[in-house]
Every structure is written in structure tokens, then in C-alpha cells.
Amino acid sequence: MKSGVAYITVQQFCTFHGCETLIIEEFMDHGIIEVQRQRDVVLIPEAQVPRIERALRLRNELGVNAAGIDIILRLLEHIEGRRWREVEDFEDFE
């Protein structure tokens, strides 16, 4: 585990969000999220929580499967990254 990084267990996340641990395991299997393992406990870094919540919404509200979620999240991150670069380029221009 990385020092200074906050974690929650998969069980805590699932209890709070009312979802099955199998869903999180499916996300892990498809590389949608990154987790840490400490003995028999799977830990979610705090920074991954918004990504998992977004993945859950895509799955539950739109019925997107894990492969589709992976593609959608990658595209959204690419778009968001481009926006930040455009903002930085604009600020450099001023």
C-alpha cells in the first residue's frame, strides 16, 4: 500500500452503495478499476471511488456491460484530459 493514500474495503464500498461485491470483482477483472490487496482484503484507493461510482451508474442506469463501461470511461478521461490541455494552452496564450 502507498503511504498517505486513504483506502476503503470493497465490502465497505458495497455496503454504502448497496451493490454486490461481484460487480466490483467484475470491474476489477475487466481492468476498469485498480485495487490493492492486503492479505484477504481488497482495498480501493480513495481516488478510485468516483470512477467506480460512475461505472456503477453506467451499469445500473443505462445497462452498459463491463466492456462498454471500460471504453466509455477511457473516452471520457481522454476528453477531460484534452479539455484541461486546452485550458492550459489558453492560459499560456494570455
Place the predicted regions along the sequence by residue.
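Arg/Lys-rich, alpha-helical DNA-contact motif
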Residues: 2-15, 22-25, 29-94
